[in-house]
Amino acid sequence: MIFKVFYQKDNTRSPRRETTEALYLDLDVATKEEGVILARELLAKNTAYHVEFIDSLSDESVEYEKETGVFEITSF
């Protein structure tokens, strides 16, 4: 299941929409809830990012992201 994570690189400042970035994680989980938990654990362990929101992507959403933006799976 692929998840899109919205985050701020600087966790010492209040989040601002203009500086929100995104990354994509491909996680082997059974449910969306398990994926959100695992994603938060991975990000806490490997980054100092301020995570704003994590959402699972449908196959259609993944195709859209590939066509319109920079789609690259992040691995830790």
From Swiss-Prot:
Its EC number is 2.7.7.6. One of its GO terms (cellular component) is DNA-directed RNA polymerase complex. It is an enzyme of class 2 (transferase). It catalyses: RNA(n) + a ribonucleoside 5'-triphosphate = RNA(n+1) + diphosphate. Keywords: DNA-directed RNA polymerase, Nucleotidyltransferase, Transcription, Transferase. GO terms for molecular function: DNA binding; DNA-directed RNA polymerase activity. One of its GO terms (biological process) is DNA-templated transcription. InterPro entries: RpoY (IPR009907). It comes from the Bacteria. The keyword Lipid metabolism does not apply. RNAP is composed of a core of 2 alpha, a beta and a beta' subunit. The core is associated with a delta subunit, and at least one of epsilon or omega. When a sigma factor is associated with the core the holoenzyme is formed, which can initiate transcription. Belongs to the RNA polymerase subunit epsilon family. A non-essential component of RNA polymerase (RNAP). This is DNA-directed RNA polymerase subunit epsilon. It comes from Lactococcus lactis subsp. lactis (strain IL1403).
